[in-house]
Structure formats: C-alpha cells, structure tokens
Amino acid sequence: MESQVAVAGDGETEAEAGKGPMIDSASQGSLVSAPKGAVRWKLLRQVLKQKQLDDGLRHVSVRRFESFNLFSVTEAKNRGTEKEAGAWVQYTSIFYPEYSISLRRNSGSLSVEDVLTSFDNTGNVCIWPSEEVLAYYCLKHSHLFRDLAVCELGGGMTCLAGLMVAISADVKEVLLTDGNEKAIRNVNSIIASNKKTGVFKTQKISSCVLRWDNKTDVSQLEGHFDIVMCADCLFLDQYRASLVDAIKRLLQPSGKALVFAPRRGNTFNQFCNLAEKAGLSLQRHENYDERISNFHSKLKKEGSDVYEENLHYPLLLILTKTG
C-alpha cells in the first residue's frame, strides 16, 4: 500500500525540508536536546497524528473505490451495550441473502506503534474489494468446499471470505489467519459472537496468527489443507515469495489455492512467475463471473475517477499443488 507520509532525513526537520506539517516552537524546543533517533520518532508522531491513518488511506488511489456492491451493510442489532472498540455491523449477501454474518469492523485509528512495529496493517483498515469478491465467489461456489479443510491467508480484521465458507458450505474445517495479532484478536471476537447465533455450518472454525515468512507458523500446518485462499495479498514485495512458499506447504497434494488480486502494475505477474518456479500449476481467469464482469465494464464506460482497473479489478488465479 502506498504511503503519503514523507519523513525528513537525519539532518533536517520537516519544516526545514519544506515538506509536511510545520512543528510549532514548543515542539521544536522539546526536540533540541533529544537523541537523533528520538527526534525522528517524535517527528513521525507529529506527521502521523495530523491525519488518522485509516482516514488518509481512503484518499489514496488504491482505496478510492470501495465496493463491487455484493454485500449490504447495516448496523448490527442488540449491540447498544458493546464497550469494545470497533463497530458491529451486519454483512448480508445481496445475491444470496440467506447468508448474513455479524462483523466487528475496526473503527479506531491505528497508533504509530501499530504502523512501525506490527506485521502488515493493510487488513486492519477496511474490507478491500478483492476480499469482497472472494467472499461472494465462495458463496456462489459453496459446493466446492464440501468435506474439505479450508484456510484463508491474510484475511485482515474480518476474514470475510473464510466466514462465508463457514456459514454456507458443508465444510470439514475452516481456519482464518492473518499475520497481524490485532487482526486475529478481532477475528476471534467475530467467531465467538457468531457461534452464539448458530450461523456456522461447521463446528471446526478457528483463527490464528500465521505469518507467511515464519517457518514455524507454516510448518505446524504443513500439508493440512485442501483449499487455501487469499485476496489482494500480492503487492508487498518482501512477502511475495514467502506467500508462494506458504501456499505450497500448507496444501495437500492436489490441493488448490484461490487467489484474487488486481494486477497492481507487475505484482500479479511477479507472483505468477514465483508460483510457476515453485512447481505450482496455474490457471488465470479475467472473466470468472458475469456479475463482476458487467459491473467492471459499467465502471470503465462511466469513466469514473475513483475506479482504476489496474488497482481495483481482481483477477482470479487458481494454483494446484501437483505431486
């Protein structure tokens, strides 16, 4: 994800560099005697506090387009006494309205510590369009998951797609994962809340922190899943190869991965190249659903300044572990 924050170099404050917000004299005075590392830290705090990160993300190009209109979102009932952070909402499929689930979305801002010290926070901000499309695809093709063990990787604060599998399919097991601990704490609360209402078709639904670059996390589940799926997880250069390796190791022989992601420059192709080198067979699909394709075409014809195919239209990649 792009960052709109520019941090001044070692030898200059942001005011001197002519960038970013000015720091008032009181703040400057408190910084003069501080070690250089502390100065940079306080400067970064000043910058990030000017605008909450989740609010700022709504204005960058990757977030201007928010939805393919596949789910309705309403305020969840009986949440008036909820004291926890985050707003509970009801997500209901527009085309399969019998499937609905209560979600706790992140409504608070991310702290500076979250940004600098936590594993990938992109999923803590919102439900991205690719996740929405994957969730819809899982509902439409719920028969594919019958009696299978399913894992969602990088599901963020809600793991919406994995939840849709758990409420619609006669699935053997569903594991919801993300590399961020804050995200998984939220997913745990979503699972616990919805178990009380009896919406899950499977009793074996759980969540855990799973970092693709952590060999221990992956090895504990090696060869366990029939289907692994993820949405819009390909654009971070430092994790792309690790994601390919994790998918291959988590899958059983002949297992499949469902990957939805926009092109985002060359990142989709780079992931495909890595997957081929790892020995996975590939099937790429651009027109995988008539509703999605029609909505995509409509947006392109309208010439909307909030929708950009390269950033927002998810392609479907099906990977198969051979041997």
UniProtKB/Swiss-Prot annotation:
Swiss-Prot/TrEMBL keywords: Cytoplasm, Methyltransferase, Nucleus, S-adenosyl-L-methionine, Transferase
Record-level GO cellular component terms: cytoplasm; nucleolus; nucleoplasm; protein-containing complex
Name of one Pfam family that matches: Methyltransf_16
Family: Belongs to the class I-like SAM-binding methyltransferase superfamily. CLNMT methyltransferase family.
Organism placement in taxonomy: Eukaryota, Metazoa, Chordata, Craniata, Vertebrata
Top-rank taxon: Eukaryota
Organism: Rattus norvegicus (Rat)
Top-level class of the enzyme under EC nomenclature: transferase
Main location class: cytoplasm
Official protein name in the record: Calmodulin-lysine N-methyltransferase
Region annotated Disordered, chain positions: 1-29
Job description of the protein: Catalyzes the trimethylation of 'Lys-116' in calmodulin.
PANTHER family the UniProt entry points to: CALMODULIN-LYSINE N-METHYLTRANSFERASE
GO BP, sorted A to Z: methylation; mitochondrion organization
Subunit structure: Monomer. Interacts with HSP90, probably as a client.
Cellular localisation: Cytoplasm; Nucleus
